Amino acid sequence: MQKLYIIKVGGNIIDNPEALTSFLKDFASLKENKILVHGGGKVATEISKGLGIEAQMVDGRRITDAETLKIVTMVYGGLINKNIVAKLQSNECNAIGLTGADANIMLSSKRPLKNGIDYGFVGDVKKVHPQPLIHLLSQGITPVVAPLTHDGNGTMLNTNADTVASELAVALCGAFAVNLVYCFELKGVLRDFEDKDSVISTINPDTYEELKSTGVINKGMIPKLDNSFNAINAGVSSVIICQAESLVELINENKTVGTKLVAN
């Protein structure tokens, strides 16, 4: 079975033009089948502020009202997605930009009230149709997927990019040996946020619960790890959380980097 790397990039990489350009050059050089999933929350937040709309976040997830939905659709599906595609094309990586609505790749349902919180137009993934992605990969085309899905009734939904990446990984397990990689600005999951070298090399479900209870893992890292363990339990070959600069070492040079998520 062929390998497939599903790589999610986020954090400060998207916001830093030099870091993003360097990362995309590395991504383009990867020899295996690959899909890129991107976030972009900080860009959307800046544009929201400029328009007088204050971003609201709960546990790393954005609350999306009707006006914010317009902004994230423009920013995620347009500005960020197409800039990434253009940069990949300049590195001889034939990429195509997509949302979950394109080719009906990813259907979601609007999240119901959760603990009294109305997340607005936020989608919880209910169905992934991997065949269009399999076809694109077979033609040597690299999908670049924005964190937007649709409800099947004409409404776009903002969807956590980590979730999009893990759901794609699970859906493509039947066709590929899928490896899920979360790339951001840190070297991995840190035991001490003040010590950027305090990388936790492996985390299993038991140590994850312990790290959450002691506050070592919190905020936006929680949905990332929740999605990671869901993917492992569903048959994804490996999940790595690492620094964007380590991507070539990990994939082309087969080196050990970052934090690896493992089953008990």
Swiss-Prot record:
Quote the subcellular location field of this record: Cytoplasm
Q: Where does substrate bind?
A: 40-41, 62, 158
TM segment ranges: none
Q: GO CC terms on record? A: cytoplasm
Give the signal sequence positions. Answer: none
UniProt cross-references to Pfam families, sorted A to Z: AA_kinase
**Coiled coil regions, renumbered to chain:** none
Q: One GO biological process from the UniProt record?
A: L-arginine biosynthetic process
Q: Name one GO molecular function term.
A: acetylglutamate kinase activity
Enzyme Commission number(s) of this protein: 2.7.2.8
Keywords per UniProt: Amino-acid biosynthesis, Arginine biosynthesis, ATP-binding, Cytoplasm, Kinase, Nucleotide-binding, Transferase
Reactions catalysed, as given in the entry: N-acetyl-L-glutamate + ATP = N-acetyl-L-glutamyl 5-phosphate + ADP
Q: In which pathway does it act?
A: Amino-acid biosynthesis; L-arginine biosynthesis; N(2)-acetyl-L-ornithine from L-glutamate: step 2/4
Q: Where is this site: Transition state stabilizer?
A: 8, 224
EC top class named in words: transferase
What this chain does, per the entry, is described as: Catalyzes the ATP-dependent phosphorylation of N-acetyl-L-glutamate.
Protein family membership: Belongs to the acetylglutamate kinase family. ArgB subfamily.
Q: What is this protein called?
A: Acetylglutamate kinase
Give the species.
Cytophaga hutchinsonii (strain ATCC 33406 / DSM 1761 / CIP 103989 / NBRC 15051 / NCIMB 9469 / D465)
